[in-house]
């Protein structure tokens, strides 16, 4: 995989001004973004998140998932901490793409869970890859991470490229009546580390 750094700009947000670093995968043409806030240290653990693109949750405020809630909470946590990063990866629908995600939602409307829907369409439950994160983290100067995630695959991906995950920070937000079954499936079938104790509900 060939990841090329492109440019950096300011990104004003409700939580403060982030820096937005653009990257291009020259093999696939996909574009990825790293958001950074404050001064990042290569020696100290940095609060961060790997976030896969979710148009429906991040931009369209869908309650079918917890993605948008996680993104906003991660940005808020980073701003309150004073520094941190988010790697925003263009892997819509756990890697199956937007239109296939809508097809999967149609199957879920008929009773399939999120894993079954992907498999009925001929896809694995999770197609995401994380090999692009190494050059992105190298560019922003991060070697030790306090990782905001419930997904053990992301912790493993960090460790495999030599990034020390000093702490896994649970990010359980946004549970509501529309996504309760989805969250349960992520826990029971995809191995996400979640507990009722950590959940923040949304009405």
Swiss-Prot record:
Its cofactor is Zn(2+). Catalyzes the conversion of GTP to 2,5-diamino-6-ribosylamino-4(3H)-pyrimidinone 5'-phosphate (DARP), formate and pyrophosphate. NCBIfam families: PRK00393.1 (NF001591), ribA (TIGR00505). GO terms for biological process: riboflavin biosynthetic process. Zn(2+) binds at residues 54, 65, 67. GO terms for molecular function: GTP binding; GTP cyclohydrolase II activity; zinc ion binding. Pfam families: GTP_cyclohydro2. The keyword Zinc applies. One of its GO terms (cellular component) is cytosol. SUPFAM superfamilies: RibA-like. The active site is at 126 (proton acceptor), 128 (nucleophile). Pathway: Cofactor biosynthesis; riboflavin biosynthesis; 5-amino-6-(D-ribitylamino)uracil from GTP: step 1/4. GTP binds at residues 49-53, 70, 92-94, 114, 149, 154. Transmembrane segments: none annotated. Keywords: GTP-binding, Hydrolase, Metal-binding, Nucleotide-binding, Riboflavin biosynthesis, Zinc. It catalyses: GTP + 4 H2O = 2,5-diamino-6-hydroxy-4-(5-phosphoribosylamino)-pyrimidine + formate + 2 phosphate + 3 H(+). Belongs to the GTP cyclohydrolase II family. Gene3D superfamilies: GTP cyclohydrolase II. The gene is ribA. It comes from Shewanella oneidensis (strain ATCC 700550 / JCM 31522 / CIP 106686 / LMG 19005 / NCIMB 14063 / MR-1). Its EC number is 3.5.4.25. Binds 1 zinc ion per subunit. This is GTP cyclohydrolase-2.
